[in-house]
A protein has these predicted regions:
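Hydrophobic alpha-helical transmembrane segments in integral membrane proteins
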Residues: 345-369
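Short glycine/proline/serine/threonine-rich loop/turn segments at secondary-structure transition edges
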Residues: 431-440
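Membrane-embedded alpha-helical bundles of multi-pass integral membrane proteins
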Residues: 1-242, 290, 303-341
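Short acidic, flexible loop segments centered on an aromatic residue
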Residues: 390-404
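Intrinsically disordered, low-complexity Pro/Gly/Ser/Thr-rich segments with frequent PxxP/GP/PP motifs
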Residues: 405-432
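Asparagine-centered strand-capping/turn motif at beta-strand->loop junctions
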Residues: 385-389
Length: 447
């Protein structure tokens, strides 16, 4: 007699289910659109602004010059890029420790462009239910063909303009526009289409999948949270047990909590999660479920805040908002803020006070020390002088370190604006005036 065992197979992979976010109005949604406008005005507008006769912000990789408003940076100024990356990392740590994934929910490019593409989709195809009906309709439907075609045209237009603007930060945008109109540009045109394709794919189709599976921040955010971090939270003590009820029914008498189980918080979520199941790595902290729940609470006459930004310790101990905020600005956050402020001030001071001149000295390996007419000993050095200003400069070169040290030929050199020039310098001393061996030499270059 054999005993049969029931076996079941659990798949680690599940087919993707399209998320149809519902449009909602509220404070957090309005703030998201404020950030969309601010970030996109900066992104699309900055390449068109001029600083004198040049583009205000331009990363000219070919010429190895980086124009940031007034200053002109060179590869030798790599320390500023390093500092900028450190500032970004510290800012992310600070914002995450205070209020979770604020960056993800309000200013991340993936969120911003997904919001723009969803707004176009909503205007053309309709709200959530209309889009779901349209997707179920046959492709022979003239309405579906017309709306889908118009939506794709709008998406492609935004994506192409985004790609063009992005490349315009690396190639003068007016020159780039003229080249594209003539189908020239080679690699520039390739990168326009590449970035446009990435924008089109990520914001139009992949959407929440980028946040769930591709973005590493979703995975390591738990290491940056603690119990005093403000996150989107469902008040289960107040909301449970959930259930549908008449507006006239007293929920306490019916043994129900304040949650009416309308699922509106799920319908508006751009990643399609149910916040009532607790903190999940897919939550981007956008606050749309807060807007949705507050709208429902207003309609049924219940207090707002069933879903709200709160800390885990505050929810557990039923603290007031004031008590929670006092714990939010804890030593960890103040430490992040102090380091961030110190580093930002140090970078600004360094950038403002930096010398607009770069000098590299290289010993000429092709020429050895030799005795020249006049009984002098000569060594040859190559100096690269980089003019970091936007006006031509005359520089005077001098050297110190040995008695009787002279320069030949003329020690004055002209360097064009934002240009560099190699100068051959011959250093001469009277033969026998210095002991054999190496001696330190100091070059001085003055404008």
């Amino acid at each position: 007699m054999s005993e049969e065992k029931n076996q079941s197979t659990v798949s680690f992979y599940a087919p993707h289910k399209k998320v149809y976010p519902r449009a909602i109005d509220g404070m957090f949604n309005r703030w998201r659109w404020v950030m969309v406008w601010v970030t996109q005005l900066v992104f699309y507008g900055l390449p068109w602004l001029q600083w004198g006769e040049r583009q205000m912000v331009l990363f000219d990789l070919g010429a190895r010059r980086f124009y940031l408003f007034g200053p002109v940076l060179y590869p030798q100024d790599f320390i500023y890029l390093t500092g900028r990356l450190v500032l970004s990392a510290l800012s992310l740590c600070l914002f995450t420790a205070v209020a979770g994934r604020l960056w993800c929910g309000f200013t991340c490019p993936q969120t911003v462009y997904t919001e723009i593409f969803m707004w176009l989709e909503n205007r053309i195809e309709g709200d959530r239910s209309a889009r779901m009906r349209l997707d179920k309709a046959a492709w022979t439907s003239p309405e579906k063909l017309a709306k889908k075609g118009l939506k794709q045209l709008a998406w492609v237009s935004v994506a192409l303009w985004t790609g063009f603007t992005f490349v315009g930060f690396f190639v003068p945008i007016r020159t780039l526009g003229a080249e594209i109109l003539q189908w020239q540009g080679g690699w520039q045109l390739f990168w326009v289409f590449f970035y446009a394709f990435a924008t089109y794919g990520f914001a139009g189709f992949m959407r929440e999948q980028v946040c769930k599976y591709m973005c590493p921040y979703a995975r390591f955010q738990s290491a940056m949270f603690d119990e005093d971090t403000l996150i989107v939270t469902y008040d289960s003590a107040r909301g449970e047990p959930r259930g549908v009820r008449s507006k006239k029914v007293d929920p306490k008498a019916a043994g129900l909590g304040d949650c009416i189980d309308c699922s509106l918080c799920v319908q508006v979520c751009p990643t399609g999660i149910d916040i009532r199941n607790g903190l999940q790595y897919e939550c981007i902290g956008c606050g749309l479920c807060v807007d949705a729940c507050n709208t429902v609470m207003d309609k049924v006459g219940y207090p707002r805040g069933l879903i709200r930004f709160a800390t885990q310790s505050g929810m557990r101990q039923r603290w007031t908002n004031h008590q929670m905020l006092r714990r939010v600005f804890r030593p960890r956050v103040l430490g992040y803020g102090a380091v961030l402020l110190t580093l930002a001030v140090a970078m600004m001071v360094s950038l403002v006070t930096r010398t607009p001149l770069k000098v590299d000295v290289v010993r000429d390996r092709t020429a050895i020390a030799r005795i020249v007419p006049g009984g002098k000993l000569e060594n040859v050095y190559q100096l690269q002088i980089m003019n970091a200003t936007e006006t031509p400069q005359h520089y005077r070169i001098s050297a110190q370190g040995l008695e009787g040290l002279t320069l030949a030929p003329d020690s004055t050199v002209q360097v064009p604006a934002t240009g560099a020039r190699w100068v051959s310098v011959q250093l001469q001393i009277p033969y026998g005036s210095a002991a054999p061996g190496s001696h330190p030499i100091h070059f001085t270059v003055q404008a």
